[in-house]
């Protein structure tokens, strides 16, 4: 997807075009959106499979959360992607170890996430500095065309950059208001 940063910042975060659950916007590269956890990877797997079968070039990128790695459809999709050697499928996992209401491991343990993906015959790239664009770009450069799905496990901190919000599940879906907006903008060096 591609959109200007100003859309995220317009009206102090209110009335922005960027919503919690995006709408389809093919012009800007958003070909599909989901709301419920675990639906993104099955759709992306189908898109990658269709491209492979019709011999169309290009790759399918999908971003999923670590919470989605607790959904059965995620792992079923990996079985399919692996069986059909979908090396045109690039899965980016936002691994912040938190979900809406608790820590990931409190709900369902996900230790050794990289080993889990490798067990499903995926090529894995761990990005320890998930907020560093150079690290992410270097990870993307390591994507292989070796008949395996590619998975980038991007280690992040929920709420990064605003110390009052970091690693606090209360901010999962809560909209900022009043002084919180001022604090957030100050911490992110925004005017």
Where are the predicted features?
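Generic beta-sheet signal
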Residues: 58-62, 89, 146-154
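Conserved thiamine diphosphate
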Residues: 56-57, 105-139, 190
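Cofactor-binding active-site loop characterized by glycine-rich and histidine/acidic residues
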Residues: 1-83
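A glycine-rich helix N-cap at a beta->alpha junction
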Residues: 13-20, 81-94, 118-122
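Acidic, glycine-rich active-site loops and adjacent beta-strand->loop/helix elements
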Residues: 1, 64-71, 95-99, 131-133, ...
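Glycine/aspartate-rich loop-and-adjacent alpha/beta segment that forms the canonical ThDP
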Residues: 133, 137-191
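A short alpha/beta connector and helix-capping loop motif
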Residues: 71-96, 151-154
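Short acidic, glycine/serine/threonine-rich loops at helix termini
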Residues: 6-9, 73-75, 101-105, 137-138, ...
């Amino acid at each position: 997807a591609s959109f200007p940063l100003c859309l995220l910042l317009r009206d102090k975060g209110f009335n922005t075009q960027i919503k919690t659950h995006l709408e389809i916007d093919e012009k800007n590269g958003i070909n599909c959106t989901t709301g419920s956890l675990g639906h993104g990877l099955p759709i992306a797997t189908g898109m990658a499979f269709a491209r492979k079968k019709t011999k169309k070039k290009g790759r399918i990128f999908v971003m999923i959360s670590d919470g989605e790695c607790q959904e059965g459809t995620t792992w079923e999709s990996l079985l399919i992607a692996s069986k059909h050697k979908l090396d045109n499928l690039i899965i980016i996992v936002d691994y912040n170890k938190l979900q809406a209401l608790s820590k990931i491991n409190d709900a369902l343990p996900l230790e050794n996430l990289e080993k889990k993906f490798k067990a499903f015959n995926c090529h894995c790239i761990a990005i320890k500095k998930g907020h560093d664009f150079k690290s992410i770009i270097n990870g993307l450069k390591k994507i292989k065309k070796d008949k395996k799905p590619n998975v980038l496990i991007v280690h992040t901190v929920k709420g990064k950059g605003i110390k009052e919000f970091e690693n606090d599940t209360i901010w999962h879906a809560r909209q900022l208001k009043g002084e919180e907006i001022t604090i957030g903008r100050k911490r992110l060096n925004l005017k």
